[in-house]
């Protein structure tokens, strides 16, 4: 009995060291060697200062910026420690009220816009941290951003097109626009 327990304990310690220490250190080392930016969280820098991540949305609220998807992370938008969906069903009165409020806010921000409001501007993603919107969501906001920045709508549309990523390998996912990168392109213009 003691020899069996000793063998089990030894195997437990060995596998803990292999899978809990050696393997993660090895994989992290490989990632930092071959994909240093990705392994560090895809941080976006402006000069020497980190201003965000390509992978986590930010709470842009100024009219001169494109707005991302609503965050489902509670009172602090885009809080990575509170990541998760709202878990509200489509008939949940709280979700219906939240969507109506978001629609009203978008209409108030650009009352002359007659385009249909894309779904991703009024509903949160599964993680609540999505950094990207659809090209349609960017197009919907283009007139508001152009007016706020006193830019031509054509220039704003060119920036949207330049920052639109196609499907991965032509088949996976949907075309998308990273909101942080698009807003940085606007600031650089």
Swiss-Prot record:
Its main location: membrane. The keyword Phosphoprotein does not apply. InterPro entries: KdpC. Keywords: ATP-binding, Cell inner membrane, Cell membrane, Ion transport, Membrane, Nucleotide-binding, Potassium, Potassium transport, Transmembrane, Transmembrane helix, Transport. It comes from the Bacteria. The system is composed of three essential subunits: KdpA, KdpB and KdpC. This is Potassium-transporting ATPase KdpC subunit.
């Amino acid at each position: 009995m003691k020899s069996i327990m000793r063998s089990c304990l030894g195997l437990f310690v060995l596998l803990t060291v292999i899978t809990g220490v050696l393997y993660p250190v090895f994989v992290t080392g490989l990632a930092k060697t071959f994909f240093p930016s990705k392994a560090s969280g895809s941080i976006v820098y402006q000069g020497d200062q980190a201003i965000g991540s390509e992978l986590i949305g930010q709470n842009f609220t100024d009219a001169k910026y494109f707005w991302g998807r609503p965050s489902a992370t509670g009172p602090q938008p885009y809080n990575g420690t509170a990541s998760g969906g709202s878990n509200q069903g489509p008939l949940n009165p709280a979700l219906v009220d939240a969507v109506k409020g978001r629609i009203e806010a978008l209409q108030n921000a650009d009352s002359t816009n007659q385009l249909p409001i894309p779904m991703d501007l009024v509903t949160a993603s599964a993680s609540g941290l999505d950094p990207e919107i659809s090209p349609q969501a960017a197009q919907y906001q283009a007139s508001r951003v152009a007016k706020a920045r006193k830019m031509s709508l054509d220039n704003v549309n060119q920036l949207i097109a330049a920052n639109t990523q196609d499907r991965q390998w032509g088949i996976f996912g949907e075309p998308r626009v990273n909101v942080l990168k698009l807003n940085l392109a606007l600031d650089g213009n």
